[in-house]
Amino acid sequence: MQNQRNEYSISLRNLSYIILTISTGIVIHRKFRRIKDIEDLSSRFFRGQQKSLTKLNSLYGYVTSVGDGDNFRFYHTPGGRLLGWHWLRKVPSNRNALKNETLSIRLSGIDAPESGYFGKLGQPFSLEAKQFLARKLEHRSVRVYPLHRDQYNRAVCGVTYYPIRWLFFKRDIGPQLVSRGLAVVYEGANSSYYPTEKSVLMKIQETARKRKLGMHSLGNKLELPKDYKKRNK
């Protein structure tokens, strides 16, 4: 009888270990699964499915390229250097290897001058905005906070970057563009603001306008990016 009890206890213990191992594996897989594209982002990641902006889900990763003054391509590196990224595991550097492996990120809360496409001239300061964003983010690690998905299948995100590489101090990139007159506060449909609130961004924009920085130096000739897009549809 005693032997049967011992065998039963061992079986229960082994079963508990198996359940714990499987549960841990599932949690680790969900926590550190690499998000390859917008289709991999489940609805729980986005702001609309979350109760508090103070507890937004976020992704840590690497900016592979900057496309415009307010968007870039993002390669998710879950766990960062702690899980070997950039020293044991490398982020691909050529276009073919990156195909279908990155998310298109649109900065939330701001609107940068439109670059020229398909033979159309870009807006004034579009090149400066793109160059500034590239200087701050390109080939560097950032943290993105998905807010919603736009009509172009981009993840609209709050984005923080690390002014000093590998340190924990972070800054919101949006206000950096607005303060230099390289972007304006976005007030279109589905506008979202994070981590800097709209009221703060508006104050920063007003200061840039008074100082006639960047786009604001154009005075009455300033055409907002949203108006430029409507005119060139």
Curated annotation (Swiss-Prot):
GO cellular-component term (any): mitochondrion
Protein EC: 3.1.-.-
Family, as annotated: Belongs to the LCL3 family.
Active-site residues (renumbered): R106, E114, R154
Intracellular or extracellular location(s): Mitochondrion; Membrane
GO molecular function annotations of the record: endonuclease activity; metal ion binding
TNase-like domain mapped to chain residues: 57-218
UniProt source species: Schizosaccharomyces japonicus (strain yFS275 / FY16936) (Fission yeast)
Topology versus the membrane: Single-pass membrane protein
Membrane spanning residue stretches: 10-29
Ligand binding (Ca(2+)): D111
Keywords: Calcium, Endonuclease, Hydrolase, Membrane, Metal-binding, Mitochondrion, Nuclease, Transmembrane, Transmembrane helix
InterPro entries: SNase_OB-fold_sf, Staphylococal_nuclease_OB-fold
Pfam families: SNase
Protein name: Probable endonuclease lcl3
